C-alpha cells in the first residue's frame, strides 16, 4: 500500500514538474517577444528624436 501512495505522489510531482516546465517555457518565449518589441520601440524612439533634432 505504501508503494502505491508513493507512486501516486511521484506521479503528481512528475505531472507538476512537466506543467511547471511548460509554463516556464511559455513565459520565457513571451519574455523574448516582449524584449524584441521593447528594443524595436527604443530604436524607433531614438530615430524619432534624431529626426527632431
Swiss-Prot record:
It is a single-pass membrane protein. The chain crosses the membrane at residues 4-24. Keywords: Host membrane, Membrane, Transmembrane, Transmembrane helix. Its main location: host cell. GO terms for cellular component: host cell membrane; membrane. It is found in: Host membrane. This is Uncharacterized protein ORF53b. It comes from Acidianus bottle-shaped virus (isolate Italy/Pozzuoli).
Amino acid at each position: 500500500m505504501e508503494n502505491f501512495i508513493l507512486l501516486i505522489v511521484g506521479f503528481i510531482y512528475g505531472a507538476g514538474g512537466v506543467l511547471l516546465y511548460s509554463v516556464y517555457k511559455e513565459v520565457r518565449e513571451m519574455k523574448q517577444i516582449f524584449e524584441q518589441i521593447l528594443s524595436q520601440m527604443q530604436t524607433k524612439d531614438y530615430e524619432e528624436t534624431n529626426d527632431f533634432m
